[in-house]
Every structure is written in C-alpha cells, then in structure tokens.
Amino acid sequence: MKKRLLGIALGSLLFTTGSAVAADYKIDKEGQHAFVNFRIQHLGYSWLYGTFKDFDGSFTFDEKNPAADKVNVTINTNSLDTNHAERDKHLRSAEFLNVAKFPQATFASTEVKKDGEDLDITGNLTLNGVTKPVTLEAKLIGQGDDPWGGKRAGFEASGKIRLKDFNITTDLGPASQEVDLIISVEGVQQKS
C-alpha cells in the first residue's frame, strides 16, 4: 500500500512539474500587437515620442522558473518614426543612430529574475555599434488561449538608457541625457 501511494505521489509530482515548462513565443508583429517605443525630453519642456516600426523577436517564458526565460529582439533602426520627417532624418544620421553604418539594434537577455509580481530582464543592448547591459522592468499583462487555437502571452516593459553610453554624444541639454524605453509585446506560442 505504501509503495502504491508513493508511486501515485511521484507520478503526480512528475505530472505537475512536467506541465510547467518553458514555452517559446514569436513576437506578433504581423498582427500589430507589439510596439518598441521611446521618449526623450525636449529642452526640458515636453516629451518627444517615437517608435521603431520594423523589428522582430522571440521569447521563452516559464512562469514558474524565470531563470529559464529568454528574450531576443532585433530592430531595424532605419524604421525610427517620430512623426516628423526632418527630425527622423537627423536621428538616423551619424550624429545619432548612424543607421547607414549600424542598421540594426539588438537586445539579448542574459538573466531574468522575479521581482514581486514583475520581472527584471537584464541583457545586452547593442545600439550604434556599442553593446551595454540594460535592465528592463517587465510585467505580464496576460496569457492564455486565442480565438485561432493558439496560445499567447503579453508583456509590457520599461527601462532607461543614457545616450552617451551608446556613443551618441550630441548635446541635447541636461534634461535630455536619458531615453525612456516603453515596450509592449504579445507573443504567439510556437508549436513544438
């Protein structure tokens, strides 16, 4: 009887731990359910907002084991859009993002840690030919089945970068030394 109970307990344990495995997701950019946005102060008087319209990426998510989570994103820096063509041209120039020489920015996570209900995602951001560690604070918005028979998970993340850290040395004034990153992604779980 004891062996039977032990077998049932072990079987239950294996079943429950087996169901909590990491799942791979592709960022849903085709459905326009993902955004890589930024904002920077303009002269300390207002916020200037922008977005990158062309990017791709994936993430691995295991709610029970954040150490297994991974994030990889590639951004086409030429897709920068601040809703002002002349400003966009200037931001794409060698004074700022130098998109002719560095057409892509990348983020690859190196560590994911639980922080209360949120996640701290640390990784290497490569921008303007410079790679630096960056930490993003992320929040799970929701996860579950979608109407098309798949599964989805969505996150919002935020962080800050200093322009000088990425060799962007144009002086925009003391209020404009940092850029806020505002990221919202929805991922479609990939079938194994």
Swiss-Prot record:
Residues 1-22 form the signal peptide. One of its GO terms (cellular component) is periplasmic space. Keywords: Periplasm, Signal. The keyword Signal applies. It comes from the Bacteria. It is found in: Periplasm. SMART domains: YceI. Its main location: periplasm. Transmembrane segments: none annotated. HAMAP family: UPF0312. Belongs to the UPF0312 family. Type 1 subfamily. This is UPF0312 protein Ent638_1570. It comes from Enterobacter sp. (strain 638). The lineage of its organism: Bacteria, Pseudomonadati, Pseudomonadota, Gammaproteobacteria, Enterobacterales.
